[in-house]
Structures are given as structure tokens and as C-alpha cells.
């Protein structure tokens, strides 16, 4: 049995989120939350919120025991990119890409 939580359209680059997700993949949920608490990245707070949601879904919707849960899957997919004008010298302009992410965390029970 697995439980999942998804945060969609999060205004942070998927590349930056993946750095944090790589730290917690395969870990026990309590250990993962501790790692996130001491990781000095902006994405760690967002990922912690999604992980807590996945844990709550597992306990309330599927009746799983928190002591046996581990992070089975943690992915950050690319969401839509907002394009903005970035003024440059001599009247030119570049496109600034404000990237968004879809963060998915799946927790499972260890047998």
C-alpha cells in the first residue's frame, strides 16, 4: 500500500528541488524530516510540507503505521514556465523564465 502527496505549480525551479529530494529518497520518514529541518535550502521547507501531507494521507486515508513508513518515491517534474521581459543594455530585452515545479512524494510501509 502506498500514499502520496503532490504539490503543483510551486514557484521554484525543479532543478533546485531535486537537490533536496535526492537527500531523502529511500529514507525513513522521521529521518527524512530531520534531514529537511537542517538543510539550508528554500526547497527544504516546501518538501517538508509535502512529506508531512503524504504521512498524514498514509495514516488517515490508508490506516498505515507511521513507524514503518519510508520515502519510496520523490520526484520534481517541470510545471509551466512564466516568461517575463528582462531589460538589457542598449534597448535590448531578454526573456526571464520563472520556472515552476510539480513535487510528488510517495510513502510506503516497510514489510
Curated annotation (Swiss-Prot):
Keywords: Ribonucleoprotein, Ribosomal protein, RNA-binding, rRNA-binding. SUPFAM superfamilies: Ribosomal protein L22 (SSF54843). GO terms for molecular function: rRNA binding; structural constituent of ribosome. It comes from the Bacteria. GO terms for cellular component: cytosolic large ribosomal subunit. Pfam families: Ribosomal_L22 (PF00237). InterPro entries: Ribosomal_uL22, Ribosomal_uL22_bac/chlpt-type, Ribosomal_uL22_bac/org-type, Ribosomal_uL22_CS, Ribosomal_uL22_sf. One of its GO terms (biological process) is translation. This protein binds specifically to 23S rRNA; its binding is stimulated by other ribosomal proteins, e.g. L4, L17, and L20. It is important during the early stages of 50S assembly. It makes multiple contacts with different domains of the 23S rRNA in the assembled 50S subunit and ribosome. PANTHER family: CHLOROPLAST 50S RIBOSOMAL PROTEIN L22-RELATED, LARGE RIBOSOMAL SUBUNIT PROTEIN UL22M. Belongs to the universal ribosomal protein uL22 family. Part of the 50S ribosomal subunit. This is Large ribosomal subunit protein uL22. It comes from Thermoanaerobacter pseudethanolicus (strain ATCC 33223 / 39E). The lineage of its organism: Bacteria, Bacillati, Bacillota, Clostridia, Thermoanaerobacterales.
